[in-house]
Amino acid sequence: GIQKKKLVTGATVQVKGDDIQKLNTVSALGALQSQTPGVNITQSSGMPGEGFNVTIRGLGTTGSSGPLYIIDGVTGADINNLNPADIESIDVLKDAASAAIYGSRAANGVVLVTTKQGKAGKASISYDGYFGVQNVYKMVPTLNAQEYAMVQNEGRLMDGLPAYDFSSLVPNWESYANGTNKGTNWLDAMRNENAPIQNHALNITGGSEQSVYSIGISYTSQEGILGKPVQPKYERYTFRLNTEHTILKNNDFDIVKFGENLTYSYSEKSGISIGNQYQNDINGALKANPFLPMYDENGDYHYALPWDVTGENPIALMKYAHGQNLTKKHNIKANVYVTLQPIKNLKIKSSFGLTMDANTYRSFVPVYELASNVYNKENKVTQQMYISSGWLWENTASYDFKINENHNFSAMIGQSIERSGLGDNLSASNVNSIF
């Protein structure tokens, strides 16, 4: 429900949509960072399209610590499918009293998202957009060839092995030894300077005293600052339609109202491997041998050096093993509701919400050989499909009243029926493909 802020006694935080828009972020959760006391928002990866981890008032469980998300009355919806320009406000319920109505699902807090609603009056059209470029403020320093040689020999001596004679192993060793040739900086080679990011949102609102509407259309695009030449990228298209209609009205209040909130989003994401230390392309670039050139004399990716036969080319491995993939996501979130107010301050509301997701993933790994232990003898094609849906039916009745001017009371009773986890998952792969 809705309460005046001065009457709320629970621990809540509200962030207005206008404040979120000003920060020019791809995700609304990114804009909430540093604006919500007691809420810790982190991102485990900076790859475009990656989500956020949210904990409210500290980590209190060994299981999932994420809060319950409710978008326009639909529980479990993904906030990353929303464009920040479509958000009217975000409320974070941090204590048990504020989130009690949601039961055990709200054990880690609740994030309530309200999208922009219609307003009576002439049609109003607004556009919000930005275009920018992204760069790394400071790259992680890596060892150059001279420093790498020194550390390698220190390690061999500690293991009781003879030091490498780099003058006989490395052509033009003198240029490395005197520091004029720094070798290959693999992390810098992955850097995508001036990676573009943009967002465009068009909103239309208007209506009459009986019916109001709000329409939103948006496009978001972001490229990764690391991953060249794979070029990680995230694109999202959204469409939103919110309407509300008054069927019967008294002089002082609306007796019968109904409305709907509909949001559709489509996104595409491609990227590199960002898993653990063994499946992480950036980690591979940090550890790679700077003596290894990126390309050989034929312009192909260079094979491992004879004296370092397991030291693969990290750029080639990133491109061949992890760089040819595409994830597509379709999401529909819909909610219809009716509100009855037979007498003033007695509100009876029934709402039905539906969420549907349809996701696909495709990847291709070609034949390659980069080192004695890093190779793929057969190409591989993988395809996955995931479809899921869920619904929620909620009914509430509330009554507000005052005793004198200083005592405000609100009583509410409600029930909900929810079904989630409906769907199918299909995965298939093949080697030696003919297409």
Segments predicted by a language model, with ranges:
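An active-site-proximal structural segment forming one wall of the substrate-binding cleft
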Residues: 346
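Surface-exposed loop/interface segments of Gram-negative outer-membrane beta-barrel transport/assembly proteins
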Residues: 120-183, 227-234, 238, 242-331, ...
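Short, small/polar-rich motifs associated with maturation and membrane association
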Residues: 1-249, 254-258, 333, 427
